[in-house]
A protein has these predicted regions:
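Parallel beta-helix/beta-solenoid repeats that form elongated, surface-exposed shafts/blades used
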Residues: 1, 6, 22-23, 28, ...
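Short, low-complexity N-terminal tether/leader segments at secretion or assembly junctions of large
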Residues: 2-24, 38, 219-227, 231-241
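Exposed extracellular interaction/assembly regions and N-terminal maturation sites
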Residues: 32-36, 41-43, 56, 63-77, ...
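Short structured motifs
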Residues: 81, 159-161, 203-207
Length: 241
């Protein structure tokens, strides 16, 4: 006698052996209707998730021990927008989108409404005659030490990524640099992109010829990529005292 576990169903008259076989075996069932979880959860193993009809990965889930926070997705009626929310047991729950690699991007298509932005910045207490400004790392760089000479600013992606690789043609990036002068008037006299000197277009029509003594000078740079390794750079120097 066959003692294996099977699924039987009634066709209205007879009890029919579905011949599925042992439940312990792996099967890929095909549904001809909606699947209702009857107000229960679907349990997904760590690093497993949802694949498409070609067996390609679409969504993966990872497990956090004793997790109390999660993501909630809500649909919307006509005229409203669906919502992805951070929810859970904590009072304040953020939402982090992490890209892969230095050149990974978070792309928002359509109009974007932002209530507030916190920008990453770097504070350095070491003066550099050639300051490599890593635009993939920060939007504000504060050189919190007095200048010892005039200096060069080199705009790049980071130590291993050229700005030419990080920016597409037609894109731009803006950076701010804060430098301190004690009783000296040193200033940024050379601007480079990926190590190549560029002639910037300066606010007011002329490049500065010095810094401001006993002040903090703030430089802003907007690099617009117009072609491969070709940039228009807008620059300004503003005294704060």
């Amino acid at each position: 006698t066959d003692k294996s576990t099977k699924i039987l169903y009634l066709n209205g008259t007879d009890v029919v052996d579905s011949n599925i076989g042992k439940l312990s075996n792996d099967y890929t069932p095909t549904l001809a209707a909606n699947l209702s979880t009857n107000s229960k959860n679907i349990i997904v193993g760590n690093t497993y998730g949802i694949i498409d009809e070609n067996a390609n990965e679409q969504i993966k889930f990872s497990t956090t021990a004793s997790a109390t926070n999660e993501i909630t997705i809500a649909n919307a009626a006509a005229g409203a927008s669906p919502v992805i929310s951070a929810t859970g047991g904590d009072t304040n729950v953020g939402l982090t989108l992490t890209t892969k690699g230095d050149l990974g991007r978070v792309t928002l298509n359509g109009e974007t409404k932002i209530f507030g932005v916190f920008e990453n910045n770097t504070i350095s207490t070491t003066f550099q005659t050639t300051l490599n400004y890593d635009l993939l790392t920060q939007a504000v760089y504060f050189q919190n030490v007095s200048c010892l000479s005039n200096f060069t600013v080199n705009l790049r992606g980071n130590s291993s990524t050229a700005l030419n690789s990080a920016l597409n043609t037609g894109e731009s990036v803006t950076a701010a640099l804060l430098v301190k002068n004690d009783n000296t008037t040193f200033y940024n006299n050379v601007i480079q992109v990926d190590g190549t000197t560029v002639t910037a277009i300066w606010q007011g029509g002329a490049a500065p010829t010095g810094g401001n003594a006993s002040s903090t000078d703030v430089y802003t740079y907007t690099a617009i990529k117009t072609a491969a390794s070709t940039y228009t750079v807008l620059a300004s120097q503003t005294q704060f005292k």
